[in-house]
Amino acid sequence: MTITMLKSKIHRATVTEANLNYVGSITIDKALMDKSNILEYEKVQIVDIDNGNRFETYVIAGEENSGVICLNGAAARMVQKGDKIIIMSYCSLTIDEANKFNPTVLFVDNKNNIEKLTNYEKHGEII
């Protein structure tokens, strides 16, 4: 048996663009992808902190160190430029693997620069 666990998270990223006329996906700064352990074309869940929308899409790599967080295609209707979002990816693990696993959690500032990289988060704490 396997269970689904949080693998990677980019916390409170700022949407820099919403491009309705582009083929679907989310464009993420390659540096943020690398640090958060999110791969190109990986399925991600997006949570918009400002409006509560939750949806899934896949990742394409943006220019490294550009700070780009751009929702493309239909997903562009779910956010607005300037919204704060949480980007999460998941993995399937056995119970034994899950008990030893820690997710990668990346905190960014208002310009999507890396503030902190951790392997855990606790309720009630902003690390």
From Swiss-Prot:
Its main location: cytoplasm. Pathway: Cofactor biosynthesis; (R)-pantothenate biosynthesis; beta-alanine from L-aspartate: step 1/1. Binds 1 pyruvoyl group covalently per subunit. It is found in: Cytoplasm. Substrate binds at T57, G73, A74, A75. Heterooctamer of four alpha and four beta subunits. HAMAP family: PanD. Catalyzes the pyruvoyl-dependent decarboxylation of aspartate to produce beta-alanine. This is Aspartate 1-decarboxylase. It comes from Clostridium botulinum (strain Loch Maree / Type A3). The gene is panD.
